Amino acid sequence: MDDNKRKSLDAALKSLDKTFGKGTILRLGDKEVEKIDSIPTGSVGLDLALGIGGVPKGRIIEIYGPESSGKTTLTLHIIAECQKKGGVCAFIDAEHALDVKYAKDLGVDTENLYISQPDFGEQALEIVETIARSGAIDLIVVDSVAALTPKAEIEGDMGDQHVGLQARLMSQALRELTGIVHKMNTTVIFINQIRMKIGMMGYGTPETTTGGNALKFYSSVRLDVRKTATLKQNDEPIGNRVKVKVAKNKVAPPFKQAEFDVMFGEGVSREGELIDYGVKLDIIDKSGAWFSYKASKLGQGRENAKAFLKENPAIADEITQAIQNSIGIDSMILGAKEDDEGDE
Protein backbone atom coordinates (compact mmCIF):
# COMPACT_ATOMS: atom_id res chain seq x y z
CA MET A 1 0.00 0.00 0.00
CA ASP A 2 1.45 3.39 -0.96
CA ASP A 3 1.92 6.20 1.59
CA ASN A 4 -1.07 8.29 0.47
CA LYS A 5 -3.48 5.36 0.76
CA ARG A 6 -2.02 4.39 4.14
CA LYS A 7 -2.41 7.94 5.48
CA SER A 8 -6.01 8.08 4.25
CA LEU A 9 -6.78 4.71 5.84
CA ASP A 10 -5.09 5.69 9.14
CA ALA A 11 -7.16 8.88 9.26
CA ALA A 12 -10.37 6.91 8.62
CA LEU A 13 -9.48 4.36 11.32
CA LYS A 14 -8.73 7.09 13.87
CA SER A 15 -12.06 8.73 13.06
CA LEU A 16 -13.90 5.42 13.58
CA ASP A 17 -12.09 4.78 16.88
CA LYS A 18 -13.00 8.27 18.07
CA THR A 19 -16.65 7.92 17.05
CA PHE A 20 -17.39 4.30 18.00
CA GLY A 21 -14.58 3.38 20.41
CA LYS A 22 -11.16 1.77 20.13
CA GLY A 23 -11.08 -1.56 18.32
CA THR A 24 -14.11 -0.85 16.11
CA ILE A 25 -12.14 -2.10 13.11
CA LEU A 26 -8.91 -4.08 13.23
CA ARG A 27 -6.59 -5.69 10.72
CA LEU A 28 -7.01 -9.44 11.17
CA GLY A 29 -3.25 -9.99 11.23
CA ASP A 30 -2.89 -7.58 14.17
CA LYS A 31 -5.42 -9.44 16.31
CA GLU A 32 -4.91 -12.86 17.85
CA VAL A 33 -7.54 -15.40 16.88
CA GLU A 34 -9.69 -15.77 19.98
CA LYS A 35 -10.51 -19.20 21.36
CA ILE A 36 -14.26 -19.60 21.36
CA ASP A 37 -15.54 -20.26 24.87
CA SER A 38 -18.21 -22.91 25.23
CA ILE A 39 -20.74 -24.37 27.64
CA PRO A 40 -20.72 -28.21 27.88
CA THR A 41 -23.96 -29.95 26.91
CA GLY A 42 -23.81 -32.78 29.45
CA SER A 43 -23.12 -35.28 26.64
CA VAL A 44 -19.55 -36.33 25.80
CA GLY A 45 -20.48 -37.27 22.24
CA LEU A 46 -22.35 -34.05 21.53
CA ASP A 47 -19.53 -31.91 22.93
CA LEU A 48 -17.18 -33.70 20.53
CA ALA A 49 -19.60 -33.33 17.60
CA LEU A 50 -19.83 -29.58 18.23
CA GLY A 51 -16.05 -29.36 17.88
CA ILE A 52 -15.37 -26.84 20.66
CA GLY A 53 -16.51 -28.78 23.72
CA GLY A 54 -20.09 -27.52 23.87
CA VAL A 55 -22.34 -24.73 22.60
CA PRO A 56 -20.48 -21.48 21.85
CA LYS A 57 -20.81 -18.48 24.16
CA GLY A 58 -22.03 -15.17 22.77
CA ARG A 59 -24.06 -16.84 20.02
CA ILE A 60 -27.65 -17.73 19.14
CA ILE A 61 -28.43 -21.46 19.16
CA GLU A 62 -31.49 -23.31 17.84
CA ILE A 63 -32.41 -26.74 19.19
CA TYR A 64 -35.30 -28.27 17.25
CA GLY A 65 -37.05 -31.58 16.74
CA PRO A 66 -40.36 -33.44 17.14
CA GLU A 67 -42.27 -33.43 20.42
CA SER A 68 -40.82 -35.52 23.28
CA SER A 69 -37.49 -35.96 21.49
CA GLY A 70 -35.37 -34.58 24.36
CA LYS A 71 -34.97 -30.90 23.43
CA THR A 72 -35.87 -29.43 26.83
CA THR A 73 -33.89 -32.15 28.64
CA LEU A 74 -30.80 -31.20 26.63
CA THR A 75 -31.20 -27.50 27.42
CA LEU A 76 -31.66 -28.24 31.13
CA HIS A 77 -28.36 -30.15 31.07
CA ILE A 78 -26.69 -27.15 29.40
CA ILE A 79 -28.12 -24.88 32.13
CA ALA A 80 -26.77 -27.24 34.82
CA GLU A 81 -23.30 -27.29 33.21
CA CYS A 82 -23.29 -23.49 32.92
CA GLN A 83 -24.23 -23.12 36.59
CA LYS A 84 -21.46 -25.55 37.62
CA LYS A 85 -18.98 -23.14 36.05
CA GLY A 86 -20.45 -20.23 38.01
CA GLY A 87 -22.72 -18.94 35.24
CA VAL A 88 -26.06 -17.18 35.73
CA CYS A 89 -28.96 -18.60 33.71
CA ALA A 90 -32.49 -17.55 32.78
CA PHE A 91 -35.37 -19.67 31.45
CA ILE A 92 -38.10 -17.94 29.43
CA ASP A 93 -40.97 -20.40 29.81
CA ALA A 94 -43.31 -19.28 27.03
CA GLU A 95 -45.02 -22.69 27.12
CA HIS A 96 -45.67 -22.37 30.90
CA ALA A 97 -44.60 -26.00 31.23
CA LEU A 98 -41.27 -26.11 33.08
CA ASP A 99 -41.10 -29.09 35.46
CA VAL A 100 -39.04 -27.68 38.35
CA LYS A 101 -38.58 -31.07 40.05
CA TYR A 102 -37.29 -32.64 36.83
CA ALA A 103 -34.92 -29.70 36.30
CA LYS A 104 -33.58 -30.19 39.83
CA ASP A 105 -33.14 -33.94 39.22
CA LEU A 106 -30.99 -33.10 36.17
CA GLY A 107 -28.68 -30.96 38.29
CA VAL A 108 -30.15 -27.50 37.73
CA ASP A 109 -29.77 -25.13 40.69
CA THR A 110 -33.41 -24.05 40.59
CA GLU A 111 -32.97 -21.70 43.56
CA ASN A 112 -30.67 -19.51 41.45
CA LEU A 113 -32.38 -19.97 38.08
CA TYR A 114 -34.23 -16.89 36.80
CA ILE A 115 -37.57 -17.76 35.22
CA SER A 116 -40.18 -15.75 33.34
CA GLN A 117 -43.56 -16.85 31.98
CA PRO A 118 -44.50 -14.11 29.48
CA ASP A 119 -48.03 -13.55 28.21
CA PHE A 120 -47.17 -12.98 24.53
CA GLY A 121 -44.25 -13.11 22.09
CA GLU A 122 -43.25 -9.44 22.12
CA GLN A 123 -43.00 -9.48 25.92
CA ALA A 124 -40.84 -12.63 25.87
CA LEU A 125 -38.38 -11.23 23.33
CA GLU A 126 -38.24 -7.87 25.13
CA ILE A 127 -37.32 -9.72 28.34
CA VAL A 128 -34.58 -11.65 26.49
CA GLU A 129 -33.13 -8.44 25.04
CA THR A 130 -33.24 -6.55 28.36
CA ILE A 131 -31.48 -9.22 30.43
CA ALA A 132 -28.97 -9.88 27.63
CA ARG A 133 -28.08 -6.15 27.55
CA SER A 134 -27.36 -6.28 31.29
CA GLY A 135 -24.28 -8.40 30.62
CA ALA A 136 -24.94 -10.30 33.86
CA ILE A 137 -26.60 -13.37 32.33
CA ASP A 138 -24.47 -16.11 30.76
CA LEU A 139 -27.24 -18.26 29.28
CA ILE A 140 -30.85 -17.60 28.27
CA VAL A 141 -33.18 -20.40 27.14
CA VAL A 142 -36.45 -19.67 25.32
CA ASP A 143 -38.97 -22.54 25.40
CA SER A 144 -40.30 -22.41 22.74
CA VAL A 145 -40.48 -20.41 19.51
CA ALA A 146 -43.87 -21.95 18.69
CA ALA A 147 -45.27 -20.48 21.93
CA LEU A 148 -44.12 -16.91 21.11
CA THR A 149 -47.59 -15.86 20.01
CA PRO A 150 -47.83 -12.23 18.82
CA LYS A 151 -50.01 -9.95 20.93
CA ALA A 152 -52.27 -9.12 17.97
CA GLU A 153 -53.08 -12.81 17.52
CA ILE A 154 -53.90 -13.28 21.22
CA GLU A 155 -56.14 -10.21 21.33
CA GLY A 156 -57.79 -10.95 17.97
CA ASP A 157 -60.86 -13.07 17.36
CA MET A 158 -60.71 -16.80 16.71
CA GLY A 159 -60.29 -17.37 12.98
CA ASP A 160 -58.62 -14.02 12.23
CA GLN A 161 -55.79 -14.23 9.71
CA HIS A 162 -52.31 -13.29 10.98
CA VAL A 163 -50.14 -14.47 8.12
CA GLY A 164 -46.42 -14.09 8.75
CA LEU A 165 -46.87 -12.12 11.97
CA GLN A 166 -44.69 -14.40 14.11
CA ALA A 167 -42.02 -14.60 11.39
CA ARG A 168 -41.79 -10.79 11.24
CA LEU A 169 -41.62 -10.62 15.04
CA MET A 170 -38.71 -13.10 15.15
CA SER A 171 -36.88 -11.39 12.29
CA GLN A 172 -37.04 -7.97 13.95
CA ALA A 173 -36.01 -9.30 17.37
CA LEU A 174 -33.08 -11.37 16.07
CA ARG A 175 -31.64 -8.46 14.08
CA GLU A 176 -31.21 -6.56 17.35
CA LEU A 177 -30.37 -9.54 19.54
CA THR A 178 -27.46 -10.94 17.50
CA GLY A 179 -25.16 -7.99 18.14
CA ILE A 180 -26.16 -7.71 21.80
CA VAL A 181 -25.41 -11.34 22.70
CA HIS A 182 -22.05 -11.21 20.92
CA LYS A 183 -21.02 -8.04 22.71
CA MET A 184 -22.18 -9.30 26.13
CA ASN A 185 -20.92 -12.88 25.57
CA THR A 186 -24.39 -14.25 26.38
CA THR A 187 -25.64 -17.48 24.82
CA VAL A 188 -29.31 -17.57 23.80
CA ILE A 189 -30.88 -20.96 23.05
CA PHE A 190 -34.23 -21.11 21.24
CA ILE A 191 -36.10 -24.41 21.48
CA ASN A 192 -38.18 -24.98 18.36
CA GLN A 193 -40.67 -27.50 17.04
CA ILE A 194 -41.11 -29.30 13.73
CA ARG A 195 -44.03 -28.63 11.40
CA MET A 196 -44.95 -30.25 8.08
CA LYS A 197 -44.86 -28.04 4.99
CA ILE A 198 -48.34 -27.64 3.52
CA GLY A 199 -48.65 -28.91 -0.05
CA MET A 200 -45.06 -30.15 -0.17
CA MET A 201 -44.43 -32.34 -3.22
CA GLY A 202 -41.33 -33.60 -4.99
CA TYR A 203 -37.81 -33.34 -3.62
CA GLY A 204 -36.67 -31.93 -0.30
CA THR A 205 -37.68 -32.51 3.29
CA PRO A 206 -41.37 -31.99 4.08
CA GLU A 207 -40.43 -30.65 7.53
CA THR A 208 -39.81 -27.09 8.62
CA THR A 209 -39.44 -25.19 11.90
CA THR A 210 -41.81 -22.52 13.23
CA GLY A 211 -41.12 -18.79 13.28
CA GLY A 212 -39.93 -18.25 9.70
CA ASN A 213 -36.39 -18.32 8.33
CA ALA A 214 -34.75 -15.65 10.51
CA LEU A 215 -33.74 -18.05 13.28
CA LYS A 216 -32.16 -20.43 10.74
CA PHE A 217 -30.09 -17.52 9.41
CA TYR A 218 -29.01 -15.90 12.69
CA SER A 219 -28.22 -19.13 14.57
CA SER A 220 -24.53 -20.02 14.82
CA VAL A 221 -25.43 -23.61 15.75
CA ARG A 222 -28.57 -25.63 14.92
CA LEU A 223 -29.13 -28.99 16.59
CA ASP A 224 -31.64 -31.50 15.20
CA VAL A 225 -32.80 -33.78 18.05
CA ARG A 226 -34.57 -37.07 17.26
CA LYS A 227 -35.67 -40.08 19.28
CA THR A 228 -34.45 -43.25 17.56
CA ALA A 229 -35.56 -45.98 19.98
CA THR A 230 -37.25 -46.67 23.30
CA LEU A 231 -35.00 -48.25 25.92
CA LYS A 232 -36.65 -51.06 27.88
CA GLN A 233 -35.80 -53.22 30.87
CA ASN A 234 -38.01 -56.24 31.55
CA ASP A 235 -40.36 -54.90 28.86
CA GLU A 236 -40.78 -51.65 30.80
CA PRO A 237 -39.77 -48.37 29.07
CA ILE A 238 -36.92 -46.72 31.02
CA GLY A 239 -35.71 -44.10 28.54
CA ASN A 240 -35.06 -43.12 24.95
CA ARG A 241 -32.12 -43.43 22.59
CA VAL A 242 -31.58 -39.97 21.10
CA LYS A 243 -29.62 -38.86 18.04
CA VAL A 244 -28.51 -35.24 17.66
CA LYS A 245 -27.28 -33.94 14.31
CA VAL A 246 -25.33 -30.68 14.12
CA ALA A 247 -27.31 -29.29 11.17
CA LYS A 248 -25.44 -25.96 11.17
CA ASN A 249 -22.18 -24.94 12.81
CA LYS A 250 -20.39 -21.63 12.25
CA VAL A 251 -17.62 -22.35 14.77
CA ALA A 252 -16.53 -25.86 13.69
CA PRO A 253 -17.23 -28.37 10.87
CA PRO A 254 -20.99 -29.14 10.72
CA PHE A 255 -23.04 -32.28 10.05
CA LYS A 256 -21.49 -34.40 12.80
CA GLN A 257 -23.77 -36.59 14.92
CA ALA A 258 -23.97 -37.90 18.46
CA GLU A 259 -26.14 -40.60 20.02
CA PHE A 260 -26.83 -41.07 23.71
CA ASP A 261 -29.37 -42.43 26.18
CA VAL A 262 -31.89 -40.14 27.87
CA MET A 263 -33.25 -41.94 30.93
CA PHE A 264 -36.66 -41.06 32.34
CA GLY A 265 -36.26 -38.91 35.44
CA GLU A 266 -32.46 -38.77 35.07
CA GLY A 267 -31.67 -37.18 31.71
CA VAL A 268 -28.55 -37.90 29.64
CA SER A 269 -26.86 -41.11 30.82
CA ARG A 270 -23.15 -40.46 31.42
CA GLU A 271 -22.62 -44.17 32.09
CA GLY A 272 -24.17 -45.10 28.73
CA GLU A 273 -21.76 -42.81 26.90
CA LEU A 274 -18.79 -44.20 28.84
CA ILE A 275 -19.75 -47.71 27.69
CA ASP A 276 -20.27 -46.60 24.06
CA TYR A 277 -16.96 -44.73 23.84
CA GLY A 278 -15.15 -47.30 25.99
CA VAL A 279 -16.07 -50.13 23.61
CA LYS A 280 -15.35 -48.00 20.54
CA LEU A 281 -11.85 -47.14 21.82
CA ASP A 282 -11.12 -50.68 23.13
CA ILE A 283 -10.99 -49.42 26.71
CA ILE A 284 -13.96 -51.59 27.68
CA ASP A 285 -13.98 -55.18 26.45
CA LYS A 286 -17.24 -56.55 25.05
CA SER A 287 -17.49 -60.31 24.78
CA GLY A 288 -20.93 -61.44 23.72
CA ALA A 289 -23.32 -59.71 26.11
CA TRP A 290 -20.67 -59.21 28.80
CA PHE A 291 -18.82 -55.93 29.39
CA SER A 292 -15.57 -55.79 31.36
CA TYR A 293 -12.91 -53.24 32.24
CA LYS A 294 -9.48 -54.60 33.17
CA ALA A 295 -10.20 -57.20 35.88
CA SER A 296 -13.69 -55.86 36.67
CA LYS A 297 -16.80 -57.44 35.19
CA LEU A 298 -19.17 -54.55 34.52
CA GLY A 299 -22.19 -56.73 33.85
CA GLN A 300 -24.13 -58.79 31.36
CA GLY A 301 -26.07 -56.51 29.05
CA ARG A 302 -25.71 -52.79 28.55
CA GLU A 303 -28.21 -51.73 31.24
CA ASN A 304 -26.50 -53.89 33.89
CA ALA A 305 -23.11 -52.45 32.91
CA LYS A 306 -24.53 -48.92 33.23
CA ALA A 307 -25.93 -49.76 36.67
CA PHE A 308 -22.51 -51.08 37.76
CA LEU A 309 -20.76 -47.86 36.70
CA LYS A 310 -23.38 -45.80 38.49
CA GLU A 311 -22.77 -47.74 41.71
CA ASN A 312 -18.97 -47.57 41.28
CA PRO A 313 -18.09 -43.93 40.48
CA ALA A 314 -14.34 -44.55 40.99
CA ILE A 315 -14.27 -47.01 38.08
CA ALA A 316 -16.46 -44.66 36.01
CA ASP A 317 -13.99 -41.82 36.66
CA GLU A 318 -11.08 -44.08 35.68
CA ILE A 319 -12.79 -44.97 32.39
CA THR A 320 -13.55 -41.28 31.83
CA GLN A 321 -9.84 -40.46 32.25
CA ALA A 322 -8.86 -43.27 29.88
CA ILE A 323 -11.28 -42.01 27.22
CA GLN A 324 -10.00 -38.48 27.71
CA ASN A 325 -6.40 -39.60 27.22
CA SER A 326 -7.30 -41.69 24.18
CA ILE A 327 -9.22 -38.96 22.37
CA GLY A 328 -6.87 -36.20 23.49
CA ILE A 329 -9.48 -33.68 24.56
CA ASP A 330 -9.39 -31.51 27.65
CA SER A 331 -11.24 -32.23 30.86
CA MET A 332 -13.86 -29.57 30.17
CA ILE A 333 -15.32 -31.62 27.32
CA LEU A 334 -15.67 -34.77 29.39
CA GLY A 335 -17.12 -32.93 32.36
CA ALA A 336 -14.29 -33.99 34.66
CA LYS A 337 -13.79 -32.25 37.96
CA GLU A 338 -10.26 -30.89 37.51
CA ASP A 339 -11.40 -27.48 36.21
CA ASP A 340 -13.73 -26.91 39.15
CA GLU A 341 -11.05 -27.89 41.65
CA GLY A 342 -8.56 -25.57 39.97
CA ASP A 343 -10.96 -22.62 40.24
CA GLU A 344 -11.43 -22.99 43.99
UniProtKB/Swiss-Prot annotation:
Keywords: ATP-binding, Cytoplasm, DNA damage, DNA recombination, DNA repair, DNA-binding, Nucleotide-binding, SOS response. Transmembrane segments: none annotated. GO terms for cellular component: cytosol. GO terms for biological process: DNA recombination; DNA repair; SOS response. The keyword Iron-sulfur does not apply. PROSITE patterns: RECA_1, RECA_2, RECA_3. It is found in: Cytoplasm. It comes from the Bacteria. ATP binds at G65, P66, E67, S68, S69, G70, K71, T72. InterPro entries: AAA+_ATPase (IPR003593), DNA_recomb/repair_RecA (IPR013765), DNA_recomb/repair_RecA_CS (IPR020584), P-loop_NTPase (IPR027417), RecA-like_C (IPR049261), RecA-like_N (IPR049428), RecA_ATP-bd (IPR020588), RecA_C_sf (IPR023400). The keyword Transmembrane does not apply. One of its GO terms (molecular function) is ATP hydrolysis activity. Belongs to the RecA family. Can catalyze the hydrolysis of ATP in the presence of single-stranded DNA, the ATP-dependent uptake of single-stranded DNA by duplex DNA, and the ATP-dependent hybridization of homologous single-stranded DNAs. It interacts with LexA causing its activation and leading to its autocatalytic cleavage. This is Protein RecA. It comes from Campylobacter lari. The gene is recA.
